[in-house]
Regions:
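N-terminal periplasmic accessory domains that precede
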Residues: 110-111, 154-157, 196-198, 213, ...
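Short acidic/polar hinge/loop motifs at secondary-structure boundaries
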Residues: 154, 160, 187-215
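Surface-exposed extracellular loop regions of Gram-negative outer-membrane beta-barrel proteins
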Residues: 228-246, 284, 305, 315-322, 532-534, 564-609, 630-657, 773-789, ...
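Outer membrane beta-barrel strand-and-loop segments of large Gram-negative receptors
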Residues: 447-451, 491-498, 598-600, 604, ...
Length: 843
């Protein structure tokens, strides 16, 4: 009997120990994602506390959400629990839940957090949201949460974005390079890439959600875009039902307005927006000189000085519509349509006077006045459709996409001359070239793109992606010149006109690999592109030709998460730029006979290699991003100006042998860029934000004929924002820049400042803003210098940047489902942007 009790006692003890051991080893996993209820963006660094319901004072687990608002953690035990999520300035989220024995996962799915709306007496609960996020290959700036977005253009907001600089002339650089591409909602926008300054200057920032700087594009992106990619994500999300926002602005420079709306019905969601702005440009003034250096003086040389002014006005409009339809939980179709563009009109006059280089006190060689009036338009119209297929395996995805884009542009100008009597008779033939003329130009680029992308996880640590693309791109340009006869009638000048087509067939394929092990993540990629270029001349000089390009483009990046709030990133990529229609157009522009310009249709694609290292640390108090970058190119496309007799310019009619400046584009040789960028945001108090975006760039450029230049340029943008009681906000911004370096000279230095105040009403549905910039001085001066063998050319420009006005926006309705977009879509970023500088044709 005693033996039986002993055995039974041992069995009870063993079973108790086993039960206790099983209880101790029992654990489950909690996961989910925390999003801002209005913007649908991840809420970073929110604090999560999990306790037993019967012991709320003792925390079982404490954790924080990551940069995307995601959280995942193991929790011991079973029974009843309480999870509390808190974030500064937010209403806490409290979730009760139970876990039974054997349950391994509690998935909370998507949780939405809202701003705290309670007031304790006269004390408001406020906080500064982080405006910058960093990933292994990109940095994101949250425009929507920046109060300055209510009164600024997108171009002004770009000055705040890390790794982006915008100088006083509104020239944009990404990673220290002016060669970059612009996307909208993950899709390339060629109009923005070709005319970023004009388009972004006209876009209201309150229509933008955030701006991404993709510093190390992976293999799925086209190989083009030396500096990187700017992805502008427009406002397009909210809460279930419908929403619409209306805005208007008026200033001393013009007026504008816009509307945005989203509606959801069943599985169909549609959003649309439209903006229009009219801009009146105050009169600006220009002056300059074009002098021959002593060693280059000949009997055909002259020094030229000029002085002029110009006034104009223009408009810009943009609109887009997106729709998505969920066929089922695994299949999604999206469609999109977009339009961007505008027009400008201007008129002005310039006085020229030429003197002998060796005797500036002698009588002028000649003098004349040129009167110009012009109008132009530029648009980009695109449409696309995407089909996305998900699978039961998480993150496995197949996407098919088609996109069509057309970019029509027109220019129409008249130039009339008045030649003063008393000119030197040796220059009579030269002055006879000054015939009143009418130039009528049309350019267009139409492209069709077909693309397939596939991505799949391999186990828990690996990701594989592959894809293929075909682009059919047709560039066409028609530049017609009409010269006035003695009666004033304009006759078509076929010899000075140019019609040509530039056809591209681009076939590409890529393969990418990703690895993520605990705190370490890395990506490797390889892309192959084959390009067939076919150039045909319909009117004007030039021989038809065909060129083939083969490019193998590698990329690699590695990131290490030092802590939950800081990371280190290292990357390498190779990028290429195919010349665009502006730099290719062979149209010979001799409106100013002393400065003749044209494009170069035989340019090769430009190839650049870049290495970058960056460190980021983002906390509720401090945001810091520091990066260093080095890039080099051995066949950079640059604008080159030379002094030469006009008889050496091929295709120029009625040359006289006089010395003139000839400007074109060429693959010049070597460029080397080294840069250091820093971004700091300090939330000094829950109501005060102080920030600075700065960069230092060293440039080395080397071309043919001994051309070489190097030097440093510095850029800094800083400011402060103060939140006052009752939803008042005030912002002050200042920026400055030293002269930037060019192959044959340098640009100008700048100083700029602005102030804005805004107030929200009606539960933040109504926002009023007042703004002013450069209010102490109406006109700003800038200058640039171009030097070459035998000449120095200086340009001075006086223009108004003074601006003040008011804006208003009002939001109605609510919406819970944003327009769903496929995770992969078409991205064409392979054309080097041109500009409205010296070159043929123009876009």
């Amino acid at each position: 009997m005693r033996t039986k009790w002993t055995v039974l006692l041992w069995m009870l003890m063993i079973s108790g120990l086993l039960a206790a051991q099983n209880t101790a080893n029992t654990s489950f996993q909690v996961k989910g994602i925390l999003l801002d209820s209005l913007t649908q963006e991840g809420e970073p660094y929110a604090t999560i506390k999990i306790v037993k319901k019967e012991a709320p004072a003792k925390a079982l687990k404490m954790l924080v959400t990551d940069m995307k608002g995601q959280f995942q953690e193991k929790v011991p035990g079973t029974g009843n629990f309480v999870m509390t999520i808190t974030s500064v300035g937010r209403t806490p989220i409290v979730k009760d839940f139970s876990v039974k024995a054997g349950e391994k996962l509690v998935d909370f799915g998507t949780l939405y957090i809202v701003d705290a709306s309670n007031e304790l007496g006269q004390v408001e609960i406020v906080a500064q949201k982080p405006l910058v996020k960093a990933d292994i290959d990109k940095i994101e700036y949250n425009v929507q949460d920046d109060p300055d977005a209510q009164s600024n253009s997108v171009l002004e907001m770009l000055r705040k974005v890390p790794l982006v600089t915008v100088d006083g002339e509104d020239n944009i650089q990404v990673n220290g390079s002016s060669s970059f591409k612009v996307y909208v909602n993950g899709k390339p926008n060629n109009m923005m890439s070709n005319n970023p300054t004009e388009v972004l200057k006209s876009m209201p920032a309150n229509s933008i959600k955030h701006i991404e700087v993709i510093t190390n594009p992976g293999p799925k992106y086209d190989a083009e875009g030396v500096g990187g990619i700017l992805n502008i994500v427009t406002v397009g999300s909210g809460l279930e039902g419908y929403t619409a926002t209306f805005s208007a602005n008026v200033s001393n420079r013009g007026a504008g307005g816009g509307a945005f709306g989203t509606i959801k019905s069943g599985k169909l969601t549609v959003s649309a927006r439209y903006n229009y702005n009219y801009n009146d440009q105050p009169r600006n003034y220009s002056s300059g000189s074009q002098h021959v250096t002593p060693e280059a003086v000949t009997e055909n040389s002259s020094n030229l000085d000029y002085d002029g002014s110009n006034k104009g006005h223009g408009s810009f409009q943009s609109g887009s519509m997106e729709a998505s339809y969920e066929i089922d939980t695994l299949r999604l179709v999206t469609m999109s349509f977009g339009l961007w563009g505008g027009g400008n009109k201007s008129n002005g006059s310039t006085d020229y006077i030429a003197t002998f280089p060796e005797n500036i006190n002698a009588a002028p060689i000649y003098s004349y006045s040129a009167f110009n009036r012009s109008k132009s338009s530029w648009y980009s119209i695109d449409g696309g459709i995407d089909y996305q297929r998900l699978f039961k395996v998480k993150d496995r995805m197949l996407t098919f996409s088609y996109k069509i884009n057309t970019r029509p542009q027109t220019s129409d100008s008249y130039t009339e001359y008045e030649i003063d009597n008393g000119y030197n008779p040796d220059w009579a033939d030269y002055l006879n070239r000054l015939k009143n003329q009418h130039n009528d130009g049309e350019q267009n680029t139409t492209e069709h793109t077909f693309q397939a992308d596939y991505t799949t996880p391999i186990g828990k640590l690996h990701t594989l992606e592959a894809g293929a693309k075909y682009i059919l791109r047709n560039n066409s340009s028609e530049d017609d010149r009409f010269d006035a006869d003695d009666t004033g009638k304009y006759e078509y000048n076929k010899d000075q006109s140019s019609h040509y087509k530039h056809l591209n067939d681009i076939i590409a394929a890529y393969l990418g690999y990703g690895l993520k092990v605990k705190r370490l993540s890395g990506r490797l990629g390889l892309r192959y592109e084959h390009t067939i270029q076919d150039v045909k001349y319909l009117v004007g000089r030039g021989e038809d030709f065909t060129k083939n390009f083969d490019d193998v483009v590698p990329s690699a990046s590695i990131g290490y998460k030092l802590t939950d709030m800081s990371n280190l990133r290292l990357g390498y990529n190779m990028r290429i730029y195919r010349p665009g229609i502006w730099s290719l157009n062979p149209y010979l522009n001799d409106t100013d006979p002393s400065y003749i310009s044209q494009g170069n249709p035989k340019l090769d694609s430009e190839k650049s290699h870049a290495f970058n290292l960056s460190y980021s640390n983002f906390t509720q108090k401090f945001n810091i991003n520091i990066s260093a970058r080095y890039s080099f190119t051995n066949n950079s496309i640059e604008n080159v100006t030379r002094l030469m007799p006009d008889t050496e310019i091929e295709g120029l009619k009625n040359p006289t042998g006089k010395d003139v400046l000839y400007s074109t584009y060429a693959n010049i040789g070597k460029t080397r860029y080294a840069s250091v960028n820093g971004y700091v945001n300090w939330n000094a108090t829950p109501r005060t934000r102080i920030y600075m975006n700065m960069s230092g760039n060293y440039s080395y450029l080397e071309g043919s004929e001994g051309m070489r230049n190097d030097g440093w340029s510095l850029f800094a943008y800083g400011g402060a924002q103060q939140t006052l009681p009752h939803d008042w906000r005030i912002s002050l911004n200042v920026f400055g820049q030293t002269p930037w370096i060019m192959l044959q000279g340098k640009g100008s230095s700048f100083f700029d400042y602005g102030l804005s105040v805004n107030k929200s009403f009606l539960d933040k549905r109504l926002t009023l803003s007042a703004f002013a910039s450069n209010f102490f001085k109406k006109y700003m001066d800038q200058s640039s210098t171009t030097e070459g063998s035998g000449f120095i050319r200086e340009s001075n420009y006086k223009y108004s940047r003074q601006r003040f006005g008011i804006s208003v926006s009002y939001r109605i309705g609510e919406l819970k489902a944003s327009v769903k977009k496929v995770a992969r879509t078409i991205s064409n970023d392979d054309v080097k942007s041109g500009g409205s500088g010296s070159g043929g044709g123009g876009e």
